[in-house]
């Protein structure tokens, strides 16, 4: 079972995504199999930060809406490090259970899952926090 970490902040622009990507990369370099989830719809930029934006074909929203197989949304960034990109918009009908189910699917496939949440304290944070342990 993967350890699940939420990286969150009440304010944007404070380096949350930088910290999330650093923790994920360092953990992967130490031999842990790591999944980094960009949970910042509309403003997510981990794909750009990690230099894989040209390879984004699907997002975690495509998994929720059954538009792709779960593995088809993952992007291998480096050895032991995969990214699950964020959708460009956050649909209002997504629930904490929907997001938690996506994370749960990958639970036994990774050692660590880092969730980069959107800025602010709102419904989106509640949804993503429900899938994390720390």
Predicted regions and their residues:
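N-terminal regions of ATP-driven nucleic-acid and macromolecular assemblies
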Residues: 1-4, 129
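Glycine-rich phosphate-binding loop used to anchor ATP phosphates in small-molecule kinases
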Residues: 107-124
């Amino acid at each position: 079972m993967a350890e699940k970490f939420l990286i969150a902040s009440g304010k944007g622009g404070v380096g949350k995504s930088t910290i999330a990507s650093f923790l994920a990369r360092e953990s992967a370099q130490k031999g842990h199999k790591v999944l980094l989830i960009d949970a910042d719809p509309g403003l997510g930029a981990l794909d750009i930060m990690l230099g894989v934006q040209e390879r984004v074909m699907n997002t975690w929203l495509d998994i929720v809406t059954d538009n792709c197989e779960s593995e088809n949304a993952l992007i291998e960034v480096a050895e032991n490090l995969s990214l699950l990109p964020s959708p460009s918009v956050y649909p209002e009908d997504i629930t904490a259970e929907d997001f938690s189910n996506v994370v749960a699917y990958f639970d036994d496939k990774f050692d660590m899952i880092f969730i980069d949440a959107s800025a602010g304290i709102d419904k989106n944070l509640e949804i993503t926090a429900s899938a994390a342990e720390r």
